[in-house]
């Protein structure tokens, strides 16, 4: 029964992706369909129309496999060795700056959310 629930949870998450892809195709949006599906899921979870516990275990199992999807993109960088050696320091600086900005903005928004709930 546990595996059936896990399969059902992952299946529903996949359906959100398919619906998002369908919406993207029908309305010819430039946003990826999977992102539209994630936004729909986020809205339904944040408005508590769908409870988080319905997806929790399935999402945890999918997160285990997430690093496997990053390996091909990392190995693909080896094809651009000369570009990375010439522009690598600029790219590294941009990544560090964008990470710091993201951390600051996320922290600020988190603080706003915490103080607004009190």
UniProtKB/Swiss-Prot annotation:
The chain crosses the membrane at residues 5-27, 31-50, 62-84, 88-110. GO terms for biological process: cytolysis; killing of cells of another organism; programmed cell death. Keywords: Cell membrane, Cytolysis, Membrane, Transmembrane, Transmembrane helix. Its main location: membrane. GO terms for cellular component: plasma membrane. NCBIfam families: PRK01658.1 (NF002460). HAMAP family: CidA (MF_01143). This is Holin-like protein CidA 2. It comes from Bacillus anthracis.
């Amino acid at each position: 029964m546990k595996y059936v629930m896990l399969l059902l949870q992952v299946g529903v998450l996949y359906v959100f992706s398919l619906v998002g892809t369908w919406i993207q195709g029908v309305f010819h949006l430039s946003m990826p369909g999977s992102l539209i599906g994630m936004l729909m899921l986020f809205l339904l979870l944040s408005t508590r129309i769908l409870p988080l516990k319905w997806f929790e275990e399935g999402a945890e199992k999918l997160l285990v496999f997430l690093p496997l999807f990053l390996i091909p993109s990392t190995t693909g960088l080896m094809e651009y060795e000369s570009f990375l050696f010439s522009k690598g320091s600029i790219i590294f600086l941009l990544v560090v700056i964008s990470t710091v900005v993201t951390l600051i903005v996320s922290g600020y928004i988190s603080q706003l959310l915490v103080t607004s709930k009190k």
